[in-house]
């Protein structure tokens, strides 16, 4: 049955108008969330899944209440998104990496390395547009990831990070 909902999602629902559009956007989001509730491990109440979100087979994805995934995001199978998370468009959460240690073999012939390290985004986080989260990291509760950042390590709770690689800018509690 899950395969049927994947077919409906990728063949139809993902192409519907964005959730930001009045009336038709809400209906489109409702269809996408309807499919996600039958695909994901957990899909909370009042969630937003915007158009063209790619999540593979989605079987291990968890998304909490009042959270949203922006347009054109990539969310791999081993991702946990907690409550009240805002994910801007084109965020990529990476699950794979290329092997490159053997210099006698071209990198393109060294198999991609599937990681089973989960990525967790804590409650009340904001992930800026076009950010990249590398595998196996935790974004602490209340954190903000600046637009275009590349997160290569865990982010402490209530920390604003930015850059490539992302570095702490300041705490949300003041300077």
Q: How would you label these PLM feature ranges?
A:
Residues 26, 53-63, 68-138, 164-165, ...:
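Flexible, glycine/small-residue-enriched loop-and-beta-strand segment within the central core
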């Amino acid at each position: 049955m899950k395969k049927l909902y994947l077919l409906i999602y990728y063949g139809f629902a993902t192409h519907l108008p964005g959730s930001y559009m009045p009336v038709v956007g809400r209906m489109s989001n409702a269809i996408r969330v309807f499919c996600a509730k039958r695909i994901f491990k957990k899909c909370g109440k009042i969630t937003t899944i915007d158009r063209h979100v790619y999540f593979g087979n989605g079987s291990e994805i968890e998304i909490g209440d009042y959270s949203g995934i922006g347009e054109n995001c990539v969310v791999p199978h081993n991702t946990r998104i907690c409550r009240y998370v805002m994910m801007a468009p084109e965020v990529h959460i990476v699950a794979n990496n290329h092997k490159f240690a053997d210099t006698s073999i071209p990198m393109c012939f060294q198999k991609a390395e599937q990681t089973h390290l989960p990525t967790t985004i804590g409650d009340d986080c904001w992930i800026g547009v076009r950010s990249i989260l590398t595998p196996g990291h935790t974004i602490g509760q209340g954190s903000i990831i600046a637009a275009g950042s590349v997160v290569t390590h865990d982010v402490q709770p209530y920390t604003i990070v930015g850059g490539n690689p992302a570095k702490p800018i300041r705490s949300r509690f003041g300077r």
